[in-house]
Amino acid sequence: MMSTDQHIQQNMNDNSNNSNNSNNNNTNNNNNNQSVNVNVNNTNNNTQTISNLSAGLKSVSLTDQQQNEVNLNLLQQQLHQEASTQQQQSRITQFFQNQPTEGFTLFSHRSAPNGFKVAIILSELNLPFNTFFLDFNNGEQRTPEFVTINPNARVPALIDHYNDNTSIWESGAITLYLVSKYLKENGECSLWSNNLIEQSQISSWLFFQTSGHAPMIGQALHFRYFHSCPVPSAVERYTDEVRRVYGVIEMALAERREALIMDLDVENAAAYSAGTTPLSQSRFFDHPVWLVGDRTTVADLSFVPWNNVVDRIGINLKVEFPEVYKWTKHMMQRPAVKRALRGD
């Protein structure tokens, strides 16, 4: 199965990175047998070429004029594409020629939830970073420079300028790299753990998010909005799978909430256990709960960007998965999450 970002990002039009010089064939003039020659050798004479071709159109027959107008439009499109490609290649080439010596560079895209997932982790850890938003329409993700740091030509990818410009790709791998590095350098990391058992629990949810949660939402979005022709069965299949995934998370959070209420609301614990008083009446019913332990970890935060777009496939978290909704709402209120989602 393709990676999640591919299903969202490949629906954008990729243009080729390199343009070859083009030659337009001569068109004979019926009256004076003159020809309009188009020979594009380099960017500097392209403007004159278009002017000559436009002038020549005035003296040819209607049929030839129509053909030359088509040729002119194609040439203009090619020149525009060539100029855009040169500009984008220059942008990414300049970055790699003058890389920072400190901090991190995150390669992302404005519509890539996995890129924002990494941005959230960087922001939560208060690590200095800059985001380089790639332009997929101009093929920046396929440039030799970028493929060097991510052979899969997808986002996200991260460069650690503190560590000899080490590059890491895939959002899960980047997340583990960041929290492990932070733990090693600072002795503790609130988003991770010193405890091996907790580390395994956090990793389980992190891998569940990267292998089940994100890909299913990505596929549902793809078949709902971007596929070349309607496939209702695919939309239904992936949307149902997203609901199944959220059912797993909802159950885990509900169990965490019940344990929290029974622990903190001691005077009413017996009534809750007997079922005479519903848990929803507890003053702790809206208290934050987390997937692992009593604090926010990367296990929780990795879900945020995708939870933020799931309404686009017709899933209402507040109605269908209330615990997931409250959990997401608490995380969305965190300053670091707000900064990351804004693209700061």
From Swiss-Prot:
One biological process term in Gene Ontology: protein localization
CC annotations in GO: cytoplasm
Domain GST C-terminal span(s) in chain numbering: 195-344
Keyword vocabulary terms for this entry: Nitrate assimilation
GO molecular function: glutathione peroxidase activity; glutathione transferase activity; phosphoprotein binding; transcription corepressor activity
InterPro entries: Glutathione-S-Trfase_C-like, Glutathione-S-Trfase_C_sf, Glutathione_S-Trfase, Glutathione_S-Trfase_N, GST_C, Thioredoxin-like_sf, Ure2
Entry superkingdom: Eukaryota
Region listing for Disordered, in residue ranges: 1-49
Compositionally biased residues, Low complexity: 9-49
Domain GST N-terminal per the UniProt entry, residue ranges: 102-186
Complex formation: Homodimer.
Family: Belongs to the GST superfamily.
Record function comment: Plays an important role in the cellular response to the nitrogen source. URE2 gene plays a major part in the repression of GLN1 and GDH2 genes by glutamine, and is required for the inactivation of glutamine synthetase. URE2 gene product may catalytically inactivate GLN3 in response to an increase in the intracellular concentration of glutamine.
The protein's name in its UniProt record: Protein URE2
Name of the encoding gene: URE2
